[in-house]
């Protein structure tokens, strides 16, 4: 391989260097987004935990016979699953992991399952496991606001109130740490009865109405918490994937540079040999 080979290797080096710049930049962006989303998750989690304490206190004052829709299931044979996926790719096995987990949960009862996807990537993945979606929500921001939460939650809640589904479950990739994310399913409705010692306190207008209003706020907070956790997992997966791609690019560049220098050395050695050979021939 002569100078033509060197030109080809230089072209490949330039191409890999361009790719490395892109993957490195995307990795840095994912790291920055993860930091911001984790901060928001921490704040929202505190809010969620405080509302949960209030719910427990209020629920202890309500009769077990209370027919609130939040506690009482209906007779529908259908269950609703909200699948949280990503809107963009390049995040490793993130979407495949969460969809595979959904498949493991509903494999034996797919005819009784209704699915809502959050994130554009979920739609195609869900079809691969033989499920259709009844609604799809896309372009969810990196830090979901109350607006996005309200749209999805109220759509699902209406189906539950109308008796179309007997359960609302959310399947997502739970954020544990930047290097660990676990697929998880959370049942949003119906809520299990909380058994605790009743506390005596005054509520206006009445405990039932206050509890229902508080539950609505609490469930939206829980849903937002789940979306934020899923977004953290997405950015972690993307950060890991891009860092891995950047490292692979570095390894390829090392091999190409080594190959380039070896060929260049061979060419120089050959040229020196030809010069020496020519000089010897003229003696």
Curated annotation (Swiss-Prot):
Q: Which SUPFAM superfamilies match?
A: ATP synthase (F1-ATPase), gamma subunit (SSF52943)
Among the GO molecular function terms of this UniProt record, one is: ATP binding
Q: Which GO terms describe its cellular component?
A: plasma membrane; proton-transporting ATP synthase complex
Q: How does it sit in the membrane?
A: Peripheral membrane protein
Q: Which UniProt keywords apply?
A: ATP synthesis, Cell membrane, CF(1), Hydrogen ion transport, Ion transport, Membrane, Transport
Entry keyword Membrane: yes
Which InterPro entries does UniProt cross-reference here? ATP_synth_F1_ATPase_gsu, ATP_synth_F1_gsu, ATP_synth_F1_gsu_CS
Pfam families per the record? ATP-synt (PF00231)
Where does it reside?
Cell membrane
The answer on whether this UniProt entry bears the keyword Cell membrane reads: yes
Taxonomy, superkingdom: Bacteria
Q: Please, one GO biological process term? A: proton motive force-driven plasma membrane ATP synthesis
Family per UniProt? Belongs to the ATPase gamma chain family.
So what does this one do? Produces ATP from ADP in the presence of a proton gradient across the membrane. The gamma chain is believed to be important in regulating ATPase activity and the flow of protons through the CF(0) complex.
Could you describe the subunit structure of this protein? F-type ATPases have 2 components, CF(1) - the catalytic core - and CF(0) - the membrane proton channel. CF(1) has five subunits: alpha(3), beta(3), gamma(1), delta(1), epsilon(1). CF(0) has three main subunits: a, b and c.
Q: Could you tell me which HAMAP family the record lists for this protein?
A: ATP_synth_gamma_bact
Query: What name appears for this protein in its UniProt entry?
Result: ATP synthase gamma chain
- In which organism is this protein found? Clostridium botulinum (strain Alaska E43 / Type E3)
UniProt lists the gene as: atpG
């Amino acid at each position: 391989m002569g100078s033509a080979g060197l030109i080809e290797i230089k072209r490949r080096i330039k191409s890999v260097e361009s790719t490395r710049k892109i993957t490195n930049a995307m990795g840095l962006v994912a790291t920055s987004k993860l930091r911001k989303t984790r901060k928001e998750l921490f704040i929202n989690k505190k809010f969620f935990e405080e509302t949960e304490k209030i719910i427990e206190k209020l629920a202890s004052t309500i009769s077990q016979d209370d027919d609130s829709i939040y506690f009482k299931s209906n007779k529908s044979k259908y269950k609703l699953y909200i699948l949280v996926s990503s809107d963009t790719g390049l995040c490793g096995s993130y979407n495949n992991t969460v969809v595979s987990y959904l498949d493991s949960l509903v494999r034996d009862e797919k005819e009784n399952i209704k699915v809502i996807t959050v994130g554009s990537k979920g739609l195609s993945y869900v079809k691969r496991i033989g499920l259709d979606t009844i609604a799809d929500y896309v372009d969810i921001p990196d830090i979901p606001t109350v607006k996005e939460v309200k749209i999805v939650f109220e759509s699902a809640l209406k189906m539950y109130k109308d008796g179309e589904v007997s359960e609302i479950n959310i399947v997502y990739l739970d954020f544990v740490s930047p290097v660990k994310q676990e697929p998880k399913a959370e049942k949003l409705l119906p809520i299990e009865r909380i058994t605790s010692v009743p506390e005596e306190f005054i509520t206006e207008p009445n405990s039932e109405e206050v509890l229902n209003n508080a539950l609505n706020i609490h469930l939206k907070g829980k849903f937002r918490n789940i979306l934020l956790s899923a977004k953290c997992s997405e950015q972690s997966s993307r950060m890991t994937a891009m860092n891995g791609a950047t490292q692979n690019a570095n390894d390829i560049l090392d091999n190409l540079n080594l190959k380039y220098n070896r060929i260049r050395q061979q060419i120089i050695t050959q040229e020196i040999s030809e010069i020496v050979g020519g000089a010897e021939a003229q003696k």
